[in-house]
Structures are given as structure tokens and as C-alpha cells.
Amino acid sequence: NAIRKRLSAVKGGRFAQWCAPAHVEAVVLSDILGDPLDMIASGPAAPDHTTCVQAVEIAKKYSLQLSETAWELLNRETPKQLTNVSTQIIGSVRELCLAAAQAARELGYEPVMLTDHLDCQAKEAGRFLGNIVRTHAADGKKLAFIAGGETVVRVVGNGLGGRNQELALSASECISGIANACVLSIGSDGTDGPTDAAGGYVDGDTVRELAENNLTVSGVLARNDAYHALKAVNGLIITGPTGTNVNDVAIALVG
């Protein structure tokens, strides 16, 4: 971002700078956890917190082959203060989680907001949600545990999948055999990894259904092949592109 902002005429607060003294009303759709205005779309209407020194150091560290003009631009500072901008965030992962909570209420579930800053390994998040389900399966309540954010996957195999599919599949062992529970995880943009799926869905029967297809959760995860495994048990969620992106949401239902 530090480099990108300096090679652009509008990023890093320069759009708002060009507009001055006119007032800018920035309406922001955030796809970054924590909603840092200077990073969302590289902050065209936000003061830039990076410096020329950082940009040059990054370029040198990675031995970037840049033109003389580009090097000159890296040494031009971006706006650090903007007095002509008002900003309103109209969509974010927090709003996504709140919408999921409202939908859960309408379906008769009591929503439990776990976090809107989920940023761990997908497998860890899946097991975490699955264990929460197992803990509350006998409570006699209809609960919806909601977590928003964006997990990561450590790719070691040559399979096909995405972080949301891997999260869901990782939860399946924890909820195996529980009749009144499920876990789903989806990307708000309708895509998950290099696949046509938005995410995945598992329930108490998923592990058994995988076994009937000669598949195990551990084996599938070792190959990073959640897509084909979930496809075999009708666990893919396919929405098509939604035209927006406010990160991911994972939901565990019990009761």
C-alpha cells in the first residue's frame, strides 16, 4: 500500500486533496478488519499514515525494478492531514455479523456474537466453533454463534478449496453425531478460493457421509481438498458473485 499510494494520483488521500477546498463526503464499504480508512481502497479520501521512507525501504528490500519516474514518485509525500472530508462506513464485517444475528432471531435462534475480528487459521476457527457447538448441544436452547473476519489457510497439498470450505470441514469432526447442529462459513463476495463456491456447510452427518465416500477429514485437510470433499456430501454453498465484499462470516447453529 505504501508504494501503491505514491504511484497513484488519487490514492493515499490525494483524491480529497485534489477536491479541496470542496467538501468530500466519503461513503465507504470496508473489506479490511478494523476498518482502517487509509487502507480501504488505498484511502483516496483518508490521510496516509505511511511514509516515503517506508515506501523506498520496501522497494529496495524486494529489489523492485522501477523506472526513474517511479523512484521519484516514491519520494513524494502523501497528505497527512485532510480537513475537507467526512466519512461514513456503510458496510463492514461488523454489519455483516449484525445482519446474520438479525436473521438468526427471525428464525428463532438466540444469536451469540463471538467476534468480528476472526483472523486465525481456518482449521483452528472451525474446530473452535465445532467445540462450542458440542459444549452447548445439550442445553436445550436454539443458539446461533456468529464469527466474522477472514481466516487463512496454510497450503501444503495440491487439492482445491478455500478458507471458508476448510473452516466448515474442520468443524465437522467436532459436531459429528450431533443431530441438532450445523456449521457454515461463507465469503460475502460469493467466492472462496479458486472455486465457484462461496463456502461450505457441515452437520452431524458429514463425517459419516465422507466415510461412505472413502474420505476422512484429516486426509482431506492434508491435501487442502475441501472443495471436492464437500461436493461429495452436498456441503458446498454456491451463490455466485454478490458484487460486494465485507469479509467472511461463520455461523454455528445448535438446538
For each predicted feature, which ranges?
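Acidic, glycine-rich active-site loops and adjacent beta-strand->loop/helix elements
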Residues: A2-L7, I32, T151-V153, G187-D192, ...
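A glycine/threonine-rich phosphate-anchoring loop and its flanking beta-alpha core
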Residues: N1-S63, G235
